[in-house]
Amino acid sequence: MSLIPRIFGDRRSSSMFDPFSIDVFDPFRELGFPSTNSGESSAFANTRIDWKETPEPHVFKVDLPGLKKEEVKVEVEEDRVLQISGERNVEKEDKNDKWHRMERSSGKFMRRFRLPENAKMDQVKASMENGVLTVTVPKEEVKKPEVKSIEISG
């Protein structure tokens, strides 16, 4: 863990300069402190997401170990915003139970991303397998310029 926030050097980290990220800038996120923009103090509240762009779709991958697909929501909004949210509830305590350690995260999470203009918002698909949520956002095909041959006279 670095003591210096990775604002400029890590292309994979959420950056305040990323035009597609709608997350609130949190200077303490990279230092390992609890998030300042969330009431939760768990790592689950700061769910990390990988977003890659391939020639055809944008692909989002989210590690959500222990969650069922019924506990996760994937939504799209009018302004090309993709929202991924969910909640893991705290295990109910029985007064006869003696807890020795409680380290698993619980709480709510929500991440929002503004998608590029070429995203086909009406064709977004999501699947969940082995605790990994995959959201696929197809892209509009780039129209290739039409090339017309000109006959040379003379």
Curated annotation (Swiss-Prot):
Subcellular compartments: Cytoplasm
One CC-aspect GO term: cytoplasm
Top-rank taxon, per record: Eukaryota
Disulfide bond sites: none
CDD domains, per the entry: ACD_ScHsp26_like
InterPro entries to which the protein is assigned, alphabetical: A-crystallin/Hsp20_dom, HSP20-like_chaperone, Small_HSP
GO biological process: protein complex oligomerization; protein folding; response to heat; response to hydrogen peroxide; response to salt stress
Residue span, sHSP domain: 40-154
GO molecular function annotation: unfolded protein binding
Coiled coil: none
Keywords: Cytoplasm, Stress response
Family stated for the protein in its record: Belongs to the small heat shock protein (HSP20) family.
Self-association and partners: Forms oligomeric structures.
Name of this chain's protein: 17.8 kDa class I heat shock protein
Naturally occurring in which organism (per UniProt): Solanum lycopersicum (Tomato)
